[in-house]
Amino acid sequence: MADRLSRSRRRLIQAGLALTAGAAAQPRFALAAAAGARTLRIGYQKGPLSLLKARGTLQDKLATLGVNVTWTEFPSGPPQLEALNAGSIDFGDVGEAPPIFALAAGAPLVYYAQTPAGPSTEAVVVAKDSPVRTFADLRGKRIALVKGSNTHFLLVRLLQAAKLDHADVKPVWLSPSDARAAFENRSVDAWIIWDPFLAVVQQTLGARIVADGTGLVENRSYYFTSRAYAQRNADVLGVAVSELTTVQRWLDANRAQGAAEFSKLWGIPEPAVALAFRRARFGVEPVTRETLAYQQHIADVFYQAGILPKRVDVSQAAPPTLA
């Protein structure tokens, strides 16, 4: 398995690395003229892409290929994939559920790379003085979360594990910022959220975790693109994945320094970022057939629960690099 993953990773970045090496030996303006004007429009959330943007290494390397990079921040995954479907971005990162809803809506997305699983990086939290002790105690209660996000799938799995029906709880669909306000003013009884928002509410409000994703979900992040962009710009995506890999490896080896940097980037207290980083698993991996099988499982669970109006075939979103 390790050899197969290594080969897949090499295929994923090979085109980009080869062209980058060639670019170093030629004048930048000549390459830009030869390649024509190209753009990589990146959507990102609070994660490693934030650091990649701040460091500027991706912009510098892609400039040698005549590629301009633009960045747009999003509060969560679903609006990122809406932007992809609308043709507004080319690349980004989302959790494990948004691609399913995007595929159901006809988005031409491709899973391009993934991170290691991080089930403990999303959780259900309640106020520190709440009488709720288990997820089952939330029967009849109002739960804030982002519709179509990774936390939506966690809600479904928590309901299954507690042997509750969807009608037994009252989802309140809110963005992370609106959910934070609702949680703080007690207009909801619980909040299902991911890091770093999870760590912040623990650190600043003393929120208590009732359940996390351990044993229920994988909770990976996925780097996505459109099929058309992948077919035309394998070199660009190869460089992007290579630079992301460098950033993620650095974060894995320098968590304390990374927490300090992200605290400044995000405007979040450093202890909260450090808490989130203690739960995080950094890295970039190639998408595998096992990955797609798990994503198909998510799609099937949503369909069987009546959340999706039709079945989704995840195989249509397989990356061109899949062996």
Language-model segments: which ranges?
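N-terminal export signals
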Residues: 4-5, 11-33
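Short, glycine-/small- and polar/acidic-enriched structural segments
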Residues: 33-165, 172-173, 189-192, 210, ...
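Solvent-exposed, polar/charged alpha-helical surfaces in well-ordered, non-transmembrane soluble domains
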Residues: 56, 60, 82, 86, ...
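Sec/Tat-exported extracytoplasmic proteins
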Residues: 62, 88, 93, 103, ...
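Short, surface-exposed acidic
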Residues: 68-70, 166-169, 266-277, 309-315
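Pocket-lining segment of extracytoplasmic ligand-binding domains
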Residues: 97, 171-172, 177-262
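Secondary-structure end/capping motifs
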Residues: 232-307
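Conserved C-terminal helix/tail region of periplasmic/extracytoplasmic solute-binding proteins
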Residues: 302-323
